[in-house]
Structure formats: C-alpha cells, structure tokens
Amino acid sequence: MLQTISLLPAYNKPPVATLLHPHRSSSSSPLPCGHVSPVTHGGLIMNPQKRLRSFSANMKCSSTNSIIDDTIIRNGQRIMMSEYFDVQLKVRDYELDQYGVVNNAAYASYCQHGCIELMESIGVSGDRISRTGDALAISELSIKFLSPLRGGDKFVMKVRYCRISAVRTYFEHKIFKLPNREPILEAKATTIWLNKKYRPTRMPLEITSLLDKFFTR
C-alpha cells in the first residue's frame, strides 16, 4: 500500500482532501521493521538547519540512464548529481526503543523529513500540491543500517534527487552522526504522483519544471 507524504507544517491542520493526516511515532509502541509511518512535518526537530553542499557519493541509483561518476545522462544532457541537501536533526527520546537506540521505524521518518525539506527548498510545498488536487506518496523505501543512533545524538540527513520520470521521483539518503560524521544509514526512496482517485498519474508541468531546474542548474 502506498504511503502518502504530508508536506504540511505541524502548526497547520492538514486538509481533508488528499494528504494523509500525520501522526507522531511513539517509543511506547514501536512500529514493525520496514513500516513507513506518516510523521508531522515538525515532529523530528523544531529548527532544522538545512543547506545545499557538494558531497562525493559512492551510492548510485539504479537506472536505465547512463551514469558516469556523479553525473547522469538524461535526454542527451549531462547533469551533475553531486549536490546533496543537508538537514541537521537531533534524536528525541520518544524515538528510542527498549534497547536505548533509535527505533528502526524512526529512520524512515527521517528519510521522509529529508524529502519534504528538499522539495520545499525548490518550491514544491504542500499548498502547491494540494492546489492540484493530487497527492505524493512513497511507493518504495530501501534502507541499509550501518550504525545506531542514541538519545541526544545530533546527525545530518543528506538527501538528493537521483532520477525523475513522468510519474516517479527517486531519492538517495545518507545519515552521518555529528560531529565526527560517522556513517549511520544509506537509503533509496521512490515517490509517486497520485490523482484524486489515488491512481498513479503524470506530474503537473509546473512541478516537473521545478525539478528540471534543480537538476540542470
């Protein structure tokens, strides 16, 4: 089942139309492995510090397009892919399990939060999506756990677009613990555009134009 993404800030009530109502995960009732739970936009950190920076990535997104180093060939044009969007977060106590480490389900929320911040940075906000009457959903999420996070840990979520198509957008995620940048996680996510009937549909032209500008700048 597809998991819709809430792009609304926590202090706004989500509309009744297309976006799923967000809920905050609780350490008292941890979710099963692999479950992607909807989260509030601000539920992970009150003041995320975000910026764009260059980062040499080893993980490549599987694609039918040609990939050379950190570039991708799309429509005959070479597009740089080394630019990650950074969001700095801090582990909250309610995200821990009985062993004192971050519950595995919380990492899916971190990845979702990174996607939200990246999309809003290029102008794809919840308001813009809701005006179309459509919704954005996660159809696939693959996570590779490298090391655990614990209560009070500060970390940086690095997210970038890997590839886009008419219906789907592909993301790559990396998490590093601060300040020593210890690798914590690598993940790949696929989002899909849905119409009013929750059927896959083509992205509106205004949205694809914004994504293309991000790729080709």
From Swiss-Prot:
Cellular component terms (Gene Ontology): chloroplast
Location in or out of the cell: Plastid, Chloroplast
Record-annotated active site: D97
GO molecular function: fatty acyl-[ACP] hydrolase activity
Main localization (coarse): plastid
Domain of life the protein comes from: Eukaryota
Keywords: Chloroplast, Hydrolase, Lipid metabolism, Plastid, Transit peptide
Enzyme Commission numbers on file: 3.1.2.-
Tissue: Mostly expressed at low levels in glandular trichomes (lupulin glands), and, to a lower extent, in stems, leaves, flowers and cones.
Residues making up the signal peptide according to the UniProt record: none
Role according to the record: Acyl-ACP thioesterase involved in the production of fatty acids and beta-keto fatty acids. May play a role in cuticular wax synthesis.
Protein name, UniProt field: Acyl-acyl carrier protein thioesterase TE1, chloroplastic
Underlying gene: TE1
